[in-house]
Amino acid sequence: MNKPFNCIGIVGHPRHPTALATHEMLYHWLTEKGYSVLIEQQIARELNLKDAPTGSLADIGQQADLAVVVGGDGNMLGAARVLSRYDIKVIGVNRGNLGFLTDLDPDHAQQQLSDVLDGHYLSEQRFMLEAHVCRTNQPDSISTAINEVVLHPGKVAHMIEFEVYIDDRFAFSQRSDGLIIATPTGSTAYSLSAGGPILTPSLEAIALVPMFPHTLSARPLVINSSSTIRLKFSCITNDLEISCDSQIALPVQEGEEVLIRRSEHHLNLIHPKNYSYFNTLSSKLGWSKKLF
């Protein structure tokens, strides 16, 4: 029987010895099982794996069939922005805190991953956002996000006055500390903390969630994922930024606008066969258990 995966990439930015131990275990275990393994360069250096085939995230995206990301959701988000450009499936081993995107338990990773490598897994596509800071006489600054794009002050907190246009039609104006534009994947992250709705991953929707608005009538808004969102500013006298997944910041200057739309790329995320989104919500958010 043909294997669904032949070349496997090992990805992550370990901050703890336990995460490094998981990387090392996976490398030796996958190699012993006969898989071609490509390990991210930084991990190979930290583990002193001198003879291991190494590569960048882009190399792994181009050459591997499956990327195993070891770490927390932050590691997954950073890897996803690169790996989403390639035809590669991605799965995560949780060495972080909540682990909404990293399903595999590190204590049982071998058995769970063995089932996945045999073809027993669930697959889904998570769409991403693309953010542009639109400049008059210069190229746009562009980045992508799998969780959210956030409009926020720079170094000093201050009120922001802006208008929101959806599909080039005026939707609303707002005075607030900022605005969170979240995907369904990001609806359980920063957006949730700000009072935004939880969107199941299969929804083709985007949530717009105000941050500390100056009026009680400002409420979260859910729109179609095909919509284009444009932010216009009355006057920028203080630092202003948009951030993507809290990892990449793009400054916004006077006279510039922000455009946010669905990216042409998506993350091919896979899960163990017994994965349940609602079980994940229940366990991560501490929801009540079944009564009967």
Swiss-Prot record:
NAD(+) binds at residues 73-74, 147-148, 158, 175, 177, 188-193, 247. Keywords: ATP-binding, Cytoplasm, Kinase, NAD, NADP, Nucleotide-binding, Transferase. GO terms for biological process: NAD metabolic process; NADP biosynthetic process. Gene3D superfamilies: Probable inorganic polyphosphate/atp-NAD kinase, domain 1, Probable inorganic polyphosphate/atp-NAD kinase, domain 2. The active site is at 73 (proton acceptor). The keyword Transport does not apply. Coiled coil: none annotated. This is NAD kinase. It comes from Pectobacterium atrosepticum (strain SCRI 1043 / ATCC BAA-672). The gene is nadK.
